[in-house]
Structures are given as structure tokens and as C-alpha cells.
Amino acid sequence: MNVLQTKLPGVLILEPQVFGDGRGYFLETWSNTRYEDAGIAGPFVQDNVAFSRKGVLRGLHLQHPRSQGKLVQVLSGEVFDVAVDVRVGSPSFGRWVGNCLSEANHRQMYIPPGLAHGYCVLSETALFSYKCTDFYNPATEIGILWNDPQLNIDWLIAAPVVSPKDAVYPRLAEIPAERLPRFGDV
């Protein structure tokens, strides 16, 4: 497995080894020892799968308290996956990193606890899978406006399809600091 660092500390791109031939391919998507050696701490307690159509944008989401680390991958199709550092006191607060994940490149992205996450679908459809280090808890859910001008995320699509809930989230600057995770605490 190849592990690539990103400009956000703790956010990793993982390229699993793929064993392929004329029949198809095989790859390992999780091995506790191998992934811990790469710097990904579990345990993972919940797996989710989301199906979306072209142009759908989901995010930006996080939980605090009970922040979730996420290991994400695309099973079919292609998405542009984004992580945003929203940890108060972090040297990279307000910065984001994005990467294309697809069934063709088999890449995974690890987003550590305390960062916001979102993605948009670039292919006709996409099947998106993610492992979480804590359970979904709607009482601690935080959303950040996907097109926050201060974040200035280039989503690679012109007119995304956004849920009514995601469309009315506040900008990062409008969220009280005490509501956000603190750098070093998660």
C-alpha cells in the first residue's frame, strides 16, 4: 500500500495494492495492522454506503463532540472528496484538501476526527463507502456551507445538486468557536 501525505496533517491518500488479471482484480480495503502502521487509528465502529447521481454534492459535515474519523472510498464511479480543517487553534484552520477517488484508481482518503468532510459526484453515478470511528449522532452534527467564500473550495462542478439541509448551513466564520473541535483535543 502506498501512503501519500496531503497538505493537511493527518489527512492521507491511500493507494492499496491491486492484484489484477483477465478475470478482474482483488484488493484489500482494510487491514488493522497495515492501516495502523500507516497512521490510521481505529477502531472503526460503523460502515456506511451512499449512492448518488452526477452533480450531487454532500457536505460539509462533521460531528462534535464525538468526532468521527473516516476512511472513504468509491466502489463505483468517481467523486471529488474534500476535507476541511475546522479545529480551532490548528495551524491549518480553514484550509482544505481535495482528491479524486474512483473505482479506477482505487484510492482511499482518511479524514481524521475534527475535520469537516464533503464530496461531489463527477461520474453518472457513484457508490461511496466510508468507515467511521464513532457512531452517527445527529445531536452533535455540525454543517458548514459547501460554497463558503472564505473556504473557496473548487468543487470541479458548476451547478451542484445540494440537499435543502446542506444548502442552508452557516459559513465557518458564523459558527461559534466553542461549537467546533479544538486542535489537540480530537
Please state what every model-predicted region is.
Residues M109, H117-L122:
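Short beta-strand His + acidic residue motifs that chelate non-heme Fe in jelly-roll/DSBH
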